[in-house]
Amino acid sequence: MINLCLAKFSPSELLECHVHNALNVMKSIMNSFIWINEFVGKDFWELLFYTIILHDVGKCAKGFQKNPKKWDYRHEILSTPFVKFLSYDEDKKNLIALSILTHHKYIEELDSGMQVIPRIYKDAYLEKVEELLENKNYLTTFFFPKINSWERLIFKKDLKKFNLSDNWEEQIKNFDFKELLEWYEENKEKRKIHLIFLKGLLNACDHLASAGEHKILTLPNLKKRVCEKLKNLRELQERVLETYKNAILEAPTGYGKTETALLWAHANLDRVGEKKVIYPNRVFYILPYKASINAMYERLKKKYLSEDGMVTILHSSSKYYLYVNEYEYKRIESLSKKIYNPLKVLTPFQIMKSFFGVGFYEMELSQLAKSLLIFDEIHAYEPNITGIILGMLEILIKDYKAKALIMSATMPTFLKELFKEVLNPQELKMEKENPDKFTRHRLNLIEGNIIDTIKDLKEYKNYYVSDNCRLEKPVLVACNTVDRAIEVYKILKKRGFNVLLIHSRFTYGDREKLEKEIKNNLKSYDFVVATQVIEVSLDVSFNSILTEPAPLDALIQRFGRVNRQGWKKGIIKDVYILKEGSEKDKYVYKNEIVKKTLEVLKEINGELLKESKVQKLIDKVYENSKDIKDEILKIKKESLQLFNNLIPLYKSGDEEKFYKLFKGLEVVPEKYFDKVKQLAKEGKYIEIYRYLVPISFYNLFKYGDSFSYDKKLKIIFTSLDYSEELGLLKNNLNEGNWIL
């Protein structure tokens, strides 16, 4: 009697079924990713084919079949020796063997402790081989004979590259892992790209098949989709359709940069097929803020890519966003981390993970090959992030043949020059259209600080007026720090105004409620007091703004929340910038940049902020930008060194560095301890997210006494006061890193 062997147990799936499904995924990728041969040669698909067939053979071990969770060995170690029976040269067999060996864990993880790769001490290995051989009849009479039919399924012909020898059991026992690892050490640089693609696409096929998906999705005709929605294409939208390379796009807010980006993507996508054309490249739409990503995901899904899975979302809290918006969050979030979706809206950090060796980075790098990267709001990043993006782009364009589109309404020329050095792009600016038709603001510099100004405001019809400003309801009051925003909110509230406060120190649940309230009931409020979160988070339109001083590019982002569609009817609204900020602003912005901004704006005080003048104004502000430029270039150089040292199949030592650089922390106010404890007890972990407040590593380390880690719940709690109205109150905390 032959015992059938399972590859998956919940639900049960036979080994040959899992392999068959993974091969179907491979077939889908092979028919789409036509460029793979440009990187790794013509026989790559054959190598991947046999890698998939053999990758889980070790699961036939009796102990694994009996109880995989309690089995004390690695099935991939037992799968690896079967490459001996492939009729390829040793180099190709070693590529397959290493990809199989590391498809779950990296080399140093397998080569330590109880999971030791059998180099010298082979007793444990030989014992597990005997377990495998107890099910050899399944392999020889049921599984391996299917290989010929799989060859015909994928390649339409017999390859006959796999042939068991008569003494195959002994050859398995005598497989030389030491020799394999020595070959790896000698060839890991020379064969780097082969190892990345072979392991990466094995993981892609394996993971998708395990998730119940048997093909990858490809994009529809984006030009057709966009043109169905737009009556006429604008000048730049026409031009990007003939831009078959990297590009930098500069256009004012309201121009339609999203549609322009989709048209650029259409122009640069590969075409596969004749009767039915598919567009196989992966497109990454990259934005700096999670709120912007959420809004873009909804827009693309509802307007252009409504089919299931065509567009997805990926950031540190996307799972919770999908959950609260009643999407099939587990499935969508799982697939978003795989190679399934053709268009991903995400933060740059999700792509950077690959270059820091985080997670299944070979799979991510495989789908980044020949990808199209759209960077919107590129001006919004700190110099260190900009430097890393530049380093990442240099490698993606040079080594992975990716293309990039950089977009911004407010990009300093020095920043544009840095990207031009990497991209060698086509520059796209309005030439025929008059940019001033997008003008919608009159600029007013006013004396004093925000506290004194709001104390003097008097209500007059639909306005709030003082000696130096006339604010039309609803008013956005933009503050540079959370503390100042709370102070302003309290004063306005005490004066009897209908006011709402929003900043980043609310729990995610409260922040979600506040954003929905602004979207649905903005006109019922006199004032909305906010920090920088309002610059990017909401697609709403205020009638006026009173803002603390900030760098010009940040101010323009804030103005973008005012009179958003006014340009269509020639409506102009006043924006008011105070000349004085607060003492704590130095932790947020460079004093010299803010000072220079005020000097530049003084020249056009009381005038229209014409779109045709914006670039010159920004360049004046940043005319002495050498320090910022040097910082960016320094980080770029360091990033390139780090990225080029990334070794495939090996766990990167830079993973911790990545999380320290970019990943903040979330804490739970102690007032929610009992609630969170109960949710954990009920297994409702996604609900716990409602009670998390984001903080920085800086504050955790510097003010550690206010935080405690619950080992059982694996959650950091804070003793700082929390109010649903005001957010997390810093008490004794320094303002420095509580800025948003």
Stretches found by the model and what they are:
Residues 279-304, 315-318, 411-415:
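Conserved Walker A/P-loop ATP-binding site and its immediately adjacent core
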Residues 2-220:
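Accessory nucleic-acid engagement/destabilization modules that flank
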Residues 2, 559, 565-740:
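C-terminal accessory region of SF2 helicases/translocases
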Residues 413-468:
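Interdomain hinge/linker at the junction between the two RecA-like core domains of SF2 helicases
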Residues 363-372, 377-434:
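Post-DEXD/H (motif II) to motif III coupling segment of the RecA-like Helicase ATP-binding lobe
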Residues 244-265:
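Walker A/P-loop
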Residues 282-296, 467-493:
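Conserved strand-helix element at the start of the C-terminal RecA-like helicase core
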Residues 70-73, 505-508, 525-572, 577-582:
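Conserved RecA-like helicase motor core of SF1/SF2 enzymes
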